Regions:
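Internal, conserved structured core segments that host functional sites
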Residues: 91-146
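Amphipathic, well-ordered alpha-helical segments in soluble domains
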Residues: 18-26, 52, 56, 110-117, ...
Length: 254
């Protein structure tokens, strides 16, 4: 399959934007995580998520070209130079996590969802997307294993367990927004780009959350914003930080 329809393009941008911003959020914990091993782990996970985003942006910039020959500037334009209203990220990946318990809870909630999301495009008719999914599925599995390892240690401890569960409760309304139907998703499914809508995996993710934290997402009210077109208040400062180096010399070729 080559040549992207408008709906498939929107579908892929939402996917890429989530991976990009989650990678950036993880990267902001490098050097300030509670212990050195987590500096290194979050650095590695951030690189993976940013790599996933780059692969998805390249598919969009290259119009689905199986050769994957996308212009680097076109990829950078998608990643850094769109206006806020043109982004399709979920607010869940936009909000700041200034507390380690919050960051760890989001790490688990996100990767438990993304593992399911990437599986939906593993057999995509869009060849470069299927190839990207092969790597991403392996990496998301490792990400989830990392988060689970920490949670196995921290949840049984009263103080840390209480803080993590409180963070999960705080994040759940926004995390449900990851499953909101994306503009163009119906077209992507009809064209075989994805095997099913992402919200068909919500029940599986809900059961994972219930089993991991003893908290039922089905009892939580969703955030009032949906559709991935309304930016959170934390988005503007996050985007400014992401553009900081580009802003030093907009004409430079990196």
């Amino acid at each position: 399959m080559s040549g992207l329809g408008g709906g498939t393009r929107e579908f892929l941008l939402a996917f890429a934007d989530d991976e990009h911003l989650m990678g950036q959020q993880h990267a902001e914990w490098i050097g300030v995580a509670p212990f050195l091993e987590e500096d290194l782990a979050f650095c590695s996970i951030a690189q993976d998520e940013l790599g996933h985003a780059a692969s998805l942006y390249a598919i969009v910039a290259g119009d689905g070209d199986p050769a994957g020959d996308a212009d680097d500037r076109a990829i950078d334009d998608l990643a850094f130079h769109r206006e806020p209203g043109d982004w399709r990220s979920a607010q869940f990946v936009e909000v700041a996590s200034t507390d380690w318990a919050h960051a760890l809870a989001r790490h688990w909630l996100y990767d438990a969802a993304e593992e399911l999301r990437w599986a939906l495009v593993a057999d995509s008719t869009l060849t470069p997307l299927a190839h990207a999914a092969q790597r991403a599925c392996r990496e998301e599995s490792f990400h989830l294993r990392h988060a689970d390892g920490l949670l196995n240690l921290l949840l049984p401890v009263p103080d840390s367990g209480d803080r993590i569960r409180a963070a999960v409760v705080d994040l759940l309304p926004l995390s449900l927004g990851l499953f909101d139907p994306v503009a163009g998703e119906a077209e992507a499914v009809a064209d075989g780009v994805a095997t099913a809508p992402f919200d068909t995996r919500l029940a599986t993710w809900t059961e994972r959350v219930r089993g991991r934290f003893g908290i039922d997402p089905a009892t939580v009210a969703r955030s009032g914003h949906s559709g991935r077109t309304v930016r959170s208040p934390d988005f503007a400062p996050l985007l400014k930080r992401m553009r900081e180096v580009f802003a030093l010399d907009p004409s430079a070729i990196w």
